[in-house]
Structure formats: structure tokens, C-alpha cells
């Protein structure tokens, strides 16, 4: 009869669930107020005109309009604004 000695246990084999971060509405897309534009950790993108920032740094539309991405300021920060149509 074949015998195999018991293998040891392992401390690997688990991983966290993906958080589905990233841009949800791209430049030029029409959005309604309340639409999530970006889910992010920290402020990779900053809130511009008609855009709010949630407590987890999620950016969302405060008004209906088109999404506009812009880079401005001395630090070349990325801002997201909503331009009314």
C-alpha cells in the first residue's frame, strides 16, 4: 500500500477582494447629478466645478452636464469638472 506522510499547513492562500476603483465616466460623457465619476484612494483627481468629493474621495456630479478633465495649477493637478450643456 502506498503511503504519503501528511503535508504541513501553509500560511498563504488568501487575497483581498478587488475594490473596483477607477474612472467610471470619461471626458465628454453626459452625466446626471449624483453620478459617480471616479472611485479612488486619495485624491489622484481633484473636484472642480459642479463636482463633489465623498468621504472616501469618490468624485460625483453635483449637476447635469458633460464631464471635463483638466490639468491646472502650479502642481499640474488633475481636476474634473462638469460643464452645463
From Swiss-Prot:
Xref: Pfam families: Ribosomal_L27
Stretch list, region Disordered: 1-20
Gene3D superfamilies: 2.40.50.100
Keyword Ribonucleoprotein listed: yes
Domain of life: Bacteria
InterPro entries, A to Z: Ribosomal_bL27, Ribosomal_bL27_CS
A Gene Ontology cellular-component term: cytosolic large ribosomal subunit
Signal peptide as annotated in the record: none
GO biological process, one term: translation
This protein's record includes keyword Ribosomal protein: yes
GO terms assigned for molecular function: structural constituent of ribosome
Keywords: Ribonucleoprotein, Ribosomal protein
HAMAP family: Ribosomal_bL27 (MF_00539)
Family, similarity comment: Belongs to the bacterial ribosomal protein bL27 family.
Protein name (record): Large ribosomal subunit protein bL27
Organism: Enterobacter sp. (strain 638)
Source taxonomy: Bacteria, Pseudomonadati, Pseudomonadota, Gammaproteobacteria, Enterobacterales
